[in-house]
Amino acid sequence: MKSIKLIAFDLDGTLLDSVPDLAVAADQAARAVGYPAVSEAQVRDYVGNGADVLIARALSQSLTINPELSPELRAQARHLFDEFYEQTGHKLSHLYPNVKTTLLELHQAGFILALVTNKPSKFVPDVLEQHGIAHFFSDVIGGDTFPNKKPDPMALNWLLEKHQLSAEQMLMVGDSKNDILAAKNAGCYSFGLTYGYNHGEPIANAEPDFVSDDIGTLLEVVLVSA
């Protein structure tokens, strides 16, 4: 794929297994507003659409959000979740295998690397610094950087415009349907990872251009013919 100049990465479920910390915070927030406890296994299914949706699903004990949850309750639980998540210090989260070496090789090869996550922006810099990968990214876009999150292509379109590239020069790497749909909506290539968070649905169902269980495979895709 000689055409690729810019590679955009999702964070949670793609580079970082952050569910252990998210689960602690979601459980504490749910119980703090008088709702049942939430397990790590549940949170693995609930992540991928931003913090507001995660908390609403946790309160609903379901992927389908209970329409009877009041906006006030959801806002209160979200505020508590943010506080608890900050207090975790992200100590339980860890990078997936081959992430750091893959980012290093891509960075050294001259690719522009960007981070496009639905995670609230305020948490992202600390997480990247803590895991020693912040310096690889020229752009870091959080879930509240723009009015619309993935699967909307707004962030990807902004990257294309900023770096003066065409859609076929960008590859989006992610673990969920939202990542693949964002890529399709922007007209760029997509690389789906099987190990992340996609609500129990195989990432192949979203029909990415490439599918792998190892982020290191990305090097073969973009460097083999470079």
Swiss-Prot record:
Catalytic-site annotation from UniProt: 10
Annotated keywords: Carbohydrate metabolism, Hydrolase, Magnesium, Metal-binding
Organism: Vibrio cholerae serotype O1 (strain ATCC 39315 / El Tor Inaba N16961)
Protein name in UniProt: Phosphoglycolate phosphatase
GO molecular function: metal ion binding; phosphoglycolate phosphatase activity
Keyword Transmembrane helix carried by entry: no
Pathway: Organic acid metabolism; glycolate biosynthesis; glycolate from 2-phosphoglycolate: step 1/1
Reaction catalysed by this enzyme: 2-phosphoglycolate + H2O = glycolate + phosphate
Function, in words: Specifically catalyzes the dephosphorylation of 2-phosphoglycolate. Is involved in the dissimilation of the intracellular 2-phosphoglycolate formed during the DNA repair of 3'-phosphoglycolate ends, a major class of DNA lesions induced by oxidative stress.
